Amino acid sequence: MSPKTETKASVGFKAGVKEYKLTYYTPEYETKDTDILAAFRVTPQPGVPPEEAGAAVAAESSTGTWTTVWTDGLTSLDRYKGRCYHIEPVPGEESQFIAYVAYPLDLFEEGSVTNMFTSIVGNVFGFKALRALRLEDLRIPTAYVKTFQGPPHGIQVERDKLNKYGRPLLGCTIKPKLGLSAKNYGRAVYECLRGGLDFTKDDENVNSQPFMRWRDRFLFCAEALYKAQAETGEIKGHYLNATAGTCEEMMKRAIFARELGVPIVMHDYLTGGFTANTSLAHYCRDNGLLLHIHRAMHAVIDRQKNHGIHFRVLAKALRMSGGDHIHSGTVVGKLEGERDITLGFVDLLRDDFIEKDRSRGIYFTQDWVSLPGVLPVASGGIHVWHMPALTEIFGDDSVLQFGGGTLGHPWGNAPGAVANRVALEACVQARNEGRDLASQGNEIIREASKWSPELAAACEVWKEIKFEFKAVDTL
């Protein structure tokens, strides 16, 4: 090769392995408004300095590989590389550190949660230099937020569609989740809706099984909600689960739901995948369907304190990918959820602007600009005695979903729905009158049960039921 045609890469190239921190640990770096910022909980292997571990995360999730390569000279690594710009120890934990990494926006495809996660968490979690790694939070810059459609409709549009204001919405997951015929399933839906619930729900694993094919379920559920609407004068919905084995089949189910005129469909966004979810969210906006999101499989990813991805990151990703509701934990029921941490990501779902607040696990200030909000869904092991706490914790912009807490009523589904609706209305009225739900909640429920035999029966059945376990997800 003559000197005239010699490439930059062949000048000064030296093969071999060098420490990541020499290139990717840059404590002097000042982050840009356009950077995606990540907070990783890093547990290095014994003998690995935290700076090297943090730099390795930055390298392996951006431009780096295990050895020096001559093609590095063909591009500007300083422009494209991730940078570990700050490391701090985790209080009370041995050999755990929070490593802050900044990624240039050019590393990511516009409007693609799939590509964002493939880059940031795709390969680095199996890295040998780390004993464990957890992505605690992401700061999504407004320049990147604006490339996403986000939720199909958002909180205000949903309330306008349903004509329901000033209170949380009420739902119920139909049980048993598997085994019912389509007609019996539709009957259970009708009983719940006519009793006063706003929504009923397919469970996450109800797709199209031999005992109940999806088309039969959609037809009987549509009949049930139209009948309940006619009797109550309220708009009703059933989350018809469109999740399927292929994107084409998923879209076929969503199209059929739209043809039936129902207001809402459902998707399991983690098992279904972000590409499928974003496609469905776009269809729902274009065709006036609300989209309920179930987070099946989330605990596989987020339950371990030192490894995986925290749910606040999955919640942010869902808001970008698209969904009008998402399950968020209850704080008081049978499923995981510590109060301050749960409310931290509930605010990340609902609000336009969220300040950094480490006491709630929020590592970065997040500005969602014009992206619509998502309603958090409290579901799992809750019943009428929990209603005051749920109303106080989650406020009006939420969905409170009682499965067993409706269908387990001794008199049947409709009385179970009546009990929940009466309890909710009593709590909202008491709150509006200035009463303290936290201290007077049980008294409020007892007062309401005096004029509602359905609520009185529910109070008697569930008076001793508690789920008292220490939360795993702590700061």
Curated annotation (Swiss-Prot):
Binding positions (Mg(2+)): 201, 203-204
List of residues binding substrate: 123, 173, 177, 295, 327, 379
Residues carrying N-acetylproline: 3
Residues recorded as bearing N6-carboxylysine in the entry: 201
Gene Ontology CC, one term: chloroplast
Entry-annotated residues carrying N6,N6,N6-trimethyllysine: 14
A Pfam family that the UniProt record links to this protein: RuBisCO_large_N
InterPro entries assigned to the protein according to its UniProt record, in alphabetical order: RuBisCO, RuBisCo_large_chain_AS, RuBisCO_lsu_C, RuBisCO_lsu_C_sf, RuBisCO_lsu_fd_N, RuBisCO_lsu_N_sf, RuBisCO_lsuI
Cofactor: Mg(2+)
Cofactor annotation comment: Binds 1 Mg(2+) ion per subunit.
Keywords: Acetylation, Calvin cycle, Carbon dioxide fixation, Chloroplast, Disulfide bond, Lyase, Magnesium, Metal-binding, Methylation, Monooxygenase, Oxidoreductase, Photorespiration, Photosynthesis, Plastid
A GO MF term: magnesium ion binding
Active-site residues, Swiss-Prot/TrEMBL: 175 (proton acceptor), 294 (proton acceptor)
Keyword Lyase tagged: yes
Marked site positions, Transition state stabilizer: 334
Catalytic activity annotation: 2 (2R)-3-phosphoglycerate + 2 H(+) = D-ribulose 1,5-bisphosphate + CO2 + H2O; D-ribulose 1,5-bisphosphate + O2 = 2-phosphoglycolate + (2R)-3-phosphoglycerate + 2 H(+)
Post-translational modification (record): The disulfide bond which can form in the large chain dimeric partners within the hexadecamer appears to be associated with oxidative stress and protein turnover.
Leading EC class: lyase
E.C. number(s) listed in UniProt: 4.1.1.39
Location(s) in or outside the cell: Plastid, Chloroplast
Extra information: The basic functional RuBisCO is composed of a large chain homodimer in a 'head-to-tail' conformation. In form I RuBisCO this homodimer is arranged in a barrel-like tetramer with the small subunits forming a tetrameric 'cap' on each end of the 'barrel'.
Role noted for this protein: RuBisCO catalyzes two reactions: the carboxylation of D-ribulose 1,5-bisphosphate, the primary event in carbon dioxide fixation, as well as the oxidative fragmentation of the pentose substrate in the photorespiration process. Both reactions occur simultaneously and in competition at the same active site.
Assembly information from the UniProt record: Heterohexadecamer of 8 large chains and 8 small chains; disulfide-linked. The disulfide link is formed within the large subunit homodimers.
HAMAP family given in the database record: RuBisCO_L_type1 (MF_01338)
Entry's family note: Belongs to the RuBisCO large chain family. Type I subfamily.
The protein's name in its UniProt record: Ribulose bisphosphate carboxylase large chain
